[in-house]
């Protein structure tokens, strides 16, 4: 698959899907074997199958959405096995699948809220208001919600709730909105496996098409964690309507894995949880590296903010130097802006497709940028600006390999 990088632009999931279609034809996603599709994903990240497998299972911000959306893919596969017309919608809306013309919202249980046969599900919106305190729009309105709620109970045996939206529990303060989280009791419920409400008969469905096998999985850890075949996992990631799994989650964790791999190759000792070295704000850096004089250097790992980059002409590489959540202010705990004392170096990890695009080769490129080179916030001078930009010359100046890492970190 050496031609893959000729079609990849920025390495987003839409680019990978487009590349596979260019190489193998427009029906590539449905006709290609799982090994070829997984190879494309791993080549894009410069990881092998085992590294990719561990990336998913060892990082809950990745595993959690993979589990949720894999349920949608698995249920769709089961429905298609008995020729039920089904359309995947996905994304951030109120509808995940359209089944026999019925709109359905699919959810996996929130395990922390489950006990025995009583299962808890969260249906609140993941974008917009962050809680009921901020706005009741945090909850879905009954009017806009899907016709049916489909909640996973178990894969083996395959059991789900199929509940008409009018029967879902409402918010106490506003009966026009659906409560989240809410609980359903699988013991004696009249809504367990009520596929007839969707106009569906699954008596002859092929449930084995989704189940993981013990000895034959390319992603054995993830398959074990989800109970699903590697093929279902890979197709979940290659679902463009749920691009956030790859673009905003998997790629971010891949950068840390790639950098740690480089550090190990260079023989540089590091701590993966800097809070154990520096309790106060240690969590605002990603790695702590110990030099020859027993001094810790704190490193913040970032990637390219593709939408803010310019790759052609007068090249500009941009990266966000701010936390995922919070507000732009100087509050000691609620600000999303980093303090200038939070880390000593910014490790800009440039993904293989972008590295290839800007002439640095089809592998990871690492830039180790001293914090003194970063721009400060215009209003809050004790914090870094939200966005940092670098020219091609800057990238070449700060780019380091194993030797550079040793010199910069161990001798500084």
What is the predicted role of each segment?
Residues 1-99, 107-284, 290-297, 303-412:
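Nucleic-acid endonuclease domains
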């Amino acid at each position: 698959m050496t031609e893959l990088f000729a079609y990849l632009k920025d390495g987003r999931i839409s680019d990978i899907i487009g590349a596979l279609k260019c190489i193998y034809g427009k029906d590539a996603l449905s006709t290609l074997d799982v090994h070829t599709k997984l190879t494309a994903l791993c080549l894009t990240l410069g990881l092998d199958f085992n590294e990719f497998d561990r990336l998913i299972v060892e990082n809950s911000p990745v595993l959690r959405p993979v589990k949720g959306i894999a349920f949608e893919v698995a249920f769709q596969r089961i429905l298609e096995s008995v020729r039920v017309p089904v359309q995947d919608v996905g994304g951030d809306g109120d509808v995940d699948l359209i089944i026999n013309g019925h709109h359905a919202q699919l959810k996996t249980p929130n395990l922390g809220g489950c006990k025995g046969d009583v299962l808890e599900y969260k249906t609140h919106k993941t974008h917009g208001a962050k809680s009921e305190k901020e706005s009741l729009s945090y909850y879905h309105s009954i009017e806009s919600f899907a016709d049916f709620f489909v909640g996973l109970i178990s894969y083996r045996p395959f059991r789900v709730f199929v509940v008409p939206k009018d029967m879902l529990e409402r918010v106490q303060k506003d009966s026009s909105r659906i409560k989240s989280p809410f609980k359903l009791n699988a013991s004696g419920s009249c809504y367990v496996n009520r596929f007839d409400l969707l106009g569906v008969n699954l008596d002859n469905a092929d449930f084995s098409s989704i189940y993981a096998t013990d000895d034959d999985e390319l992603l054995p850890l993830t398959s074990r964690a989800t109970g699903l075949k590697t093929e279902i996992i890979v197709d979940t990631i290659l679902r463009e309507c749920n691009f956030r799994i790859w673009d905003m989650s998997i790629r971010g964790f891949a950068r840390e894995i790639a950098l740690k791999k480089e550090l190990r190759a260079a023989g540089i000792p590091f701590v993966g949880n800097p809070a154990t070295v520096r309790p106060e704000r240690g969590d605002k850096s990603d790695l702590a590296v110990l030099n020859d004089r027993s001094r810790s250097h704190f490193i913040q790992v970032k990637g390219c903010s593709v939408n803010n980059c310019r790759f052609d002409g007068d090249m500009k590489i941009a990266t966000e130097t701010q936390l995922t959540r919070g507000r732009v202010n100087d509050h000691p705990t609620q600000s999303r802006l980093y303090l200038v004392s939070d880390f000593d170096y910014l490790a800009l990890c440039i993904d293989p497709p972008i590295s290839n695009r800007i002439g640095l080769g089809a592998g990871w490129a690492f830039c180790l940028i001293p914090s003194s080179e970063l721009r400060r916030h215009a209003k809050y001078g004790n914090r870094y600006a939200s966005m940092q930009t670098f020219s091609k010359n800057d990238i070449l100046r700060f780019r380091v390999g194993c030797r550079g890492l040793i010199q910069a970190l161990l001798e500084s």
